Amino acid sequence: MQRITLEQVFKHHITQKYVNRSGMVHAIAVAYHAFHLAKKHHASVDAATKAGFLHDIGHHTWYTGGEWDYDLYKKNDIHAIKGAERSHKLLIRLGEHPKLAKEISVAILLHTDSFLLEQTLERTPLQNVIKWADEADEEPGGAHHYRTISYEKALKAIQQLDRLVERELQIEQKKLNDKAEHSYQ
C-alpha cells in the first residue's frame, strides 16, 4: 500500500472546505508541531502530521454576527467527535491503510478534553502528541482560528512537511534494515 501524503489530504475538497473553516494556518502549524513532538516522543511522524493537520476538521461554524463566538463554541462543541468521523472517512477514501486511518482518527477524537466528562484518560504517545501540538499553537479566545494564508503558500508548507516526513520515514526504515542485518550476522 502506497503512503498517502499530506499533499493528497490537503488538496481534497473535503479538507479544503472544513480545514479552511477552522483555520488552515492553525492546521499547518499543529502538523509541524506534531512532527517534531512525534520524533521526540517516539510516535509515528506520518500519523502525527496527518492527525495534527486534520485535528479541527470537525469544527462547526460557531459564529455570532459574522465573528467566531468562542463562548458558544466552548459551551456546545463536539468538534473532536465529528472530526474523528470526518477524518476517518476522508483518509479511507484517499486509500489510507484502515489501521492507520483509525489510529489518526482516535488521536483526533482525544486531542481535546472539551467534550469529556472525566479527564483521567490514558493516552498513547500519538494521542498526547496531537493534544500537545494543538495546545502549542492555541491563542486566547480562539484567535488561532482567524489567521489566514494563501492556497499557494499553504501548499508549499504542506509539501515541505511531506519532504520532512518522507526523510524521517527513510531514516527509520534504514535503522530497521540495519538492525535486521545485524541480527542475521
What are these regions (language model features)?
Residues 1-3, 18-44, 54, 96, ...:
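Divalent metal-dependent phosphate-bond-processing catalytic cores, especially two-metal-ion Mg2+/Mn2+ enzymes
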Residues 4-29, 64-71:
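Active-site flanking loop/helix segments enriched in acidic
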Residues 9-13, 108, 130:
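A generic structural signal for nonpolar/aromatic side chains embedded in well-ordered alpha-helices
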Residues 24, 28-31, 49-50, 101-109:
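Short, well-structured alpha-helical segments
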Residues 30, 37, 77-93:
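An active-site-proximal "capping" alpha-helix that borders the catalytic cofactor pocket
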Residues 46-68, 83, 105-113:
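His-Asp-centered metal-binding catalytic motifs of divalent-metal-dependent phosphohydrolases/nucleases
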Residues 67-77, 122:
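A charged helix-plus-loop insertion that forms the helical arch/lid used to bind
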Residues 86-104, 110, 114:
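Internal catalytic-core helix/loop-beta-alpha segment
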